[in-house]
Amino acid sequence: MTGSVRLRGLAVGTALSLCLTSPALADGMAKFEKLIKPQLPEGSLTYKSGKGLGDNGFVLEGVVVTPPPDTPSGKTEPIAIKKISVEDFDFTAFEKQTPPTYAKVRIEGIAVSDKPAEGIDLKEMAGIDKFNMDFQVDYRLEPERKTLTLNKLELDLSGLARLELSMILDGVSPDIAGDPDAAMNDATLRTATFVFEDRSILAKAVPAIAKMQGGDAAATLLIAKTMMAPLRTGQGPKAQAAFDAIESFVDDYKKPKGPLKVTLNPPDKVSATALSSAAGADDVIKALGLDVSYSGTVPHPAPKKQ
């Protein structure tokens, strides 16, 4: 909801992922090689081949990124990436050290090991071996209209799940990128859509969570519903329908009958600050014009007031 935070997050995330920092050269690849690559720590980014993609884009293939360690004595494993495609990027804004007003980037084949971080063993926890991940971001800020359009922010975990977010925010400008408080008050949501497509991750994650809790999957689902019950109590039909969809999706964790989709279409301008005063689920749903849909939804009895 905070326009500036989202804009800054998109800008920084894109820049760090692609190591972009400025330029005013004619070819996207030339901009990268002449002005960006020399600034990177030695050995932090390598690639087998690269080519320009118009004035503001480039493609790198056979990429290996070695992130800096968390501590001076620490060590990090290199991350293999099949391809990074920058179709369009606002080099001019970045050269001025201001948030890029547009970016369209696709990162394909990010290799994720079964031990992505210290103390985390996905294979032991959930039977998840190493897998590939794709990432896409496509956004544009119109400073004159103070409108941020996120056409797509997508994370695709091969064989596990896909998450996609799109939205339009009003009241967003580069000037408030460093002022979260102003963004909370000024940025308003026009519309948003979130899609969670499960392919197998819930079937792996639910039993894994149950194992960590010392129980079984049924007990874990019961705990989740028990925690959700107070949020449902005393709420109206629209709130109950939203909770029905969520609970049905979780009930079908072994094999969901389609994606879970959340859409937001506020009837009036709504900011994060305004939402903070919501008294319950009904208020939130009314303010956001929220709708949760799942093709396998079945009614669940609403908890009664005590």
Predicted features, each with a name:
Residues L20-Q306:
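Glycine-rich, small/hydroxylated-residue low-complexity segments
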Residues M1-V12:
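Bacterial N-terminal signal peptides that target proteins for export
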Residues A11-T21:
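Bacterial N-terminal signal peptides
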